[in-house]
Amino acid sequence: MSEAQKMDTPEQAAFRAHCQEWLANNLPGRPTVKLPLGALELSDPNALAWLQEWQKSAYDAGLIGCDYPREVGGGGRENCQSIANTEMQRAQTPYLPNIIGMGMAAPTVFFHGRDEVKAELLPKLLSGEEIWCQGFSEPGAGSDLANQQTFAERDGDNWVINGHKVWTSLAHFAEWMILLCRTSKDDKYNGLSYFVVPIEKALGNGVTVRPLI
């Protein structure tokens, strides 16, 4: 028994046993397509689909989104995601494709989004059914976020966003983007806002995605 296991609460110990049993019986076979080294290098839609199927099965088994409340698609547990991650790593499972969604979008949406937004976005994010990308870097500015030029302007109840983003990994597969842009030009270090943008629905209607490599 590892030191971590010795510190498990009864609930965590039961959950760890569930993870171990499920993984022992449900690991996928050899990939039917060639997979790149990591999710951010995905370019083959068939590889993405294979990995999405794996993420959905792990999500349905309760190994992903464990610590989020049930009402937003989570498992309703406490301090259990790290246990699932450890057991998946030990079992040498495939990587999860929706890493930007899970690592960057989900926490922000959960802690800052309205209840109806969380209920709409988080279940399919955690299951991997909807892929997310990030829109931070820009031509000429790279990752210098203070030099953002993409601008969002109010138009009644809507926002109109104009600009360009680069190195938007997974954008060619994504339904959603977490987008950082300027809503005020008064101060270089202020006036930055964070948007959730449905880029797939806007393709050909103001949004263009072009792979660089």
Model-derived features: where do they sit?
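Amphipathic, small/basic residue-rich leader segments at the start of a protein or domain
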Residues: 1-99, 120, 124-127
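Residue-level signal for inorganic ion chemistry
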Residues: 12, 114, 195
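Tryptophan-centric aromatic hotspots in well-structured domains and transmembrane helices
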Residues: 15-16, 22, 26, 54, ...
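N-terminal glycine-rich flavin-associated loop
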Residues: 97-116, 142
